[in-house]
From Swiss-Prot:
Source organism: Campylobacter hominis (strain ATCC BAA-381 / DSM 21671 / CCUG 45161 / LMG 19568 / NCTC 13146 / CH001A)
Gene Ontology CC annotations of this record: ribonucleoprotein complex; ribosome
Keyword Glycosyltransferase: no
Descriptive protein name: Large ribosomal subunit protein uL24
Recorded superkingdom: Bacteria
InterPro entries xref list: KOW, Rib_uL2_dom2, Ribosomal_uL24, Ribosomal_uL24_CS, Ribosomal_uL24_KOW, Translation_prot_SH3-like_sf
Keywords, in A-Z order: Ribonucleoprotein, Ribosomal protein, RNA-binding, rRNA-binding
Recorded family membership: Belongs to the universal ribosomal protein uL24 family.
Assembly: Part of the 50S ribosomal subunit.
Length: 76
C-alpha cells in the first residue's frame, strides 16, 4: 500500500474533471482504493429509503470518492 502525502483536513485543488479548479477540504482518505473524498466536490444525488427518521424517503446530495491522482495539495 502506497503512502500518501494528502491527509484528512488538508486543502486540495481539483486538477481534472467537472470540478477542475475548485479548492476543498479532504473529508476522508481511502488508501486501499487510492481515493479521497473532498468537501463540495463530485456531488451525486443519492436516493434514501423511507425509515422511521424519514418516513417519506427522498434524495440527498453526497460527496463521492475521486482518485487521489485527480487532486493536488494546496500549500499554506
Amino acid at each position: 500500500m502506497a503512502k500518501f502525502k494528502i491527509k484528512k483536513g488538508d486543502d486540495v485543488k481539483i486538477i481534472t474533471g467537472d470540478d477542475k479548479g475548485k479548492i476543498g477540504k479532504v473529508l476522508s482518505v481511502l488508501p486501499k482504493k487510492s481515493q479521497v473524498i473532498v468537501e463540495g466536490c463530485k456531488i451525486a444525488k443519492k436516493a434514501i429509503k423511507p425509515s422511521e427518521k424519514n418516513p417519506k424517503g427522498g434524495f440527498i446530495n453526497k460527496e463521492m470518492p475521486m482518485d487521489i491522482s485527480n487532486v493536488a495539495l494546496v500549500e499554506g
